[in-house]
From Swiss-Prot:
PROSITE patterns: DIHYDROOROTASE_1 (PS00482), DIHYDROOROTASE_2 (PS00483). It comes from Halorhodospira halophila (strain DSM 244 / SL1). This is Dihydroorotase. Homodimer. Zn(2+) 1 binds at residues 13, 15, 99, 247. Its EC number is 3.5.2.3. Zn(2+) 2 binds at residues 99, 136, 174. Binds 2 Zn(2+) ions per subunit.
Amino acid sequence: MDTLTLPRPDDWHLHLRDGALMQAVAPQAAAVFSRAIIMPNLQPPVTTVEQAAAYRQRILGALPAGSTFEPLMTLYLTDKTSPEEIVRAAASGFVHAVKLYPAGATTHSDAGVTDLLLCYDALAAMEEQGLPLLIHGERTGPELDIFERETAFIDDVLQPLLDRHPRLKVVLEHVTTAVGAELVTGDDPRLAGTFTPQHLLYNRNDLLVGGLKPHYYCMPILKREADREALLEAATSGHPRVFLGTDSAPHPRGAKESACGCAGCYTAPIALSLYAEAFEAAGALERLADFAGRNGPAFYGLPVNPETVTLERAPLEVPASYPGGDEPVVPLRAGESLAWRLHQP
């Protein structure tokens, strides 16, 4: 197979940041994706419908003339999120989900949830409104090994949450473990999972062996090879509730290449090429169209994009960096050649 045509894809987990960085990276994502679930972890976080509306307008204002890219907005769940705000979000027409960051789990998560029991009424309202909860599934705390955070979260937080809220739709985002992969490919119709290109392609050796590679560093951190294999099997299985979510997370080069580097891999401009590489390695290229273009809309109750794109087997030279406003952004696989690229008519 030398070409693959699929519905124009959506990204169900995307960071666009704000300010000059957003002005630079939003057009790069819009060139690849039709829609994207936009993460709310700004400073300050997007916690109200009013803030989400303003952020949406800033994103739309950063797009080139004629762009049809649609930002699907989210709210940042806090201990104080009210049921009334959830009702307003569901009625807005542009807020499509609420994001759970456990406090301290990742970039700009300090305002995150400290105890889900404090969010009981908001989560109950989400059940009533059919608004999905998107989860950064890591437990935090000094006693937890960083490589065990996801499995601890599933056992100690996620399962009790699902039991307490039997009608709540949940997306376990950026699944990184075999335990998580098994969970989201189970029989629970409320539960879906997104998979990033880096977690399908790489393990923790790729991050650490032969020198620390800051542009492979993300949260949740890359795991064991056995986990990567389980993720790839799940993502390429054809299961209807697994779909594309890059977690593309731009940081200025200096914030990554430092003594205390930020977590996040920048992949949006090359994401489809990376996913094609992973799916081809699994012998499942024919399943990429559902993963990238159909499963996500089905879970969110949205139409599949009528436009199509075509991947072709031809070298794609990844640039050393992309424009990032005040400072360049270095992508994953910078300076390397990928085997698949989007066909440019």
